[in-house]
Amino acid sequence: MLDPRARTLLKTLIERYIADGQPVGSRTLSRYSGLELSPATIRNVMSDLEELGLVSSPHTSAGRIPTPRGYRLFVDTMLTVEAPIDAEAVARQVQNTLQAGEPQQRVVAAAASVLSNLSQFAGVVLTPRRSHVFKQIEFMRLSDKRILLIIVTPEGDVQNRMLATPRDYSPSQLTEASNYINAHFAGLSFDEVRRRLRDEIDQLRGDMTTLMHAAVTASTEVPDTEDTVLISGERNLLEVADLSSDMARLRKLFDVFDQKTGLLQLLDVSSHAQGVQIFIGGESTLVPIEEMSVVTAPYEVNGKIVGTLGVIGPTRMAYNRVIPIVDITARLLSLTLSQQ
């Protein structure tokens, strides 16, 4: 545990480093901390913080900078999110960008764009997962022995399957089959529907059972679409000296964007937690670049978490500004998708 004096000095150091990007010396800490301490006392406290792994000393400067561990303590226990931005203006911009009624993929892509524009860093969104259950199905007769199966998921995603049947079905028979499935099985997975059909087979005519089994088989044979990571504003990070000043670091950053595997894992981890999460660079393999951090939040459709969004930027970012941007965007994206 840090005593109040050490906490104040660490908080001041990190705030000044975020603002100025320069190692922070004892004179700056004396000026901004509000504490009446001698330079020698401040240096002693800094030495203690360095031994604790909360700050480090660059070789080229007498000042100190925060470590990933120092940033973690700061965002977990010292950060006050009183955004220096107009939250209502941010909400209006997000609402104007996310238009209800647009295709889901377009709305999600717009969320990545607005995150990038507001933060001036990179916006990232893990698109909604394909549902394993269905809300409604329809059969449409195309020709003799060819039927179009239309599946609507709870998220509003529409999927089509072609069915080749051993016999022809009339429109009224197709309506009867879809009405039965929607009335008895909506909200279940197709594996559950298959099990239920076995139990109820005696209640159905043989030709209807054949059609329903064909629909269930076609639905489960198609592999799930892979989770997709959408990124907007990568070029903004070229303007961030902390990330772009070193060519090896820059190459590693764009490898993260190109491969997306690490981002997918990070966003998936975030989707299992409530509210805003902050991933500090260098803390774990999830964020392999010490100078990069990610602020994320899950978003929902009708109360169910379906994806994650966030901002990728430098570890030296104004967290009190970025956190509300991510939080507001996640809430309004959830609202927009739930209204579709």
Curated annotation (Swiss-Prot):
Keywords attached to this entry: Repressor, Stress response, Transcription, Transcription regulation
GO biological process: one example: negative regulation of DNA-templated transcription
InterPro entries registered for this protein in UniProt: GAF-like_dom_sf (IPR029016), HrcA (IPR002571), HrcA_C (IPR021153), WH-like_DNA-bd_sf (IPR036388), WH_DNA-bd_sf (IPR036390), WHTH_HrcA_DNA-bd (IPR005104), WHTH_transcript_rep_HrcA_IDD (IPR023120)
GO molecular function, one term: DNA binding
NCBIfam families referenced in this protein's UniProt entry, alphabetically: hrcA
Role, per record: Negative regulator of class I heat shock genes (grpE-dnaK-dnaJ and groELS operons). Prevents heat-shock induction of these operons.
Family note: Belongs to the HrcA family.
PANTHER family: HEAT-INDUCIBLE TRANSCRIPTION REPRESSOR HRCA
Protein name, per record: Heat-inducible transcription repressor HrcA
Annotated organism of origin: Burkholderia cenocepacia (strain ATCC BAA-245 / DSM 16553 / LMG 16656 / NCTC 13227 / J2315 / CF5610) (Burkholderia cepacia (strain J2315))
Lineage: Bacteria, Pseudomonadati, Pseudomonadota, Betaproteobacteria, Burkholderiales
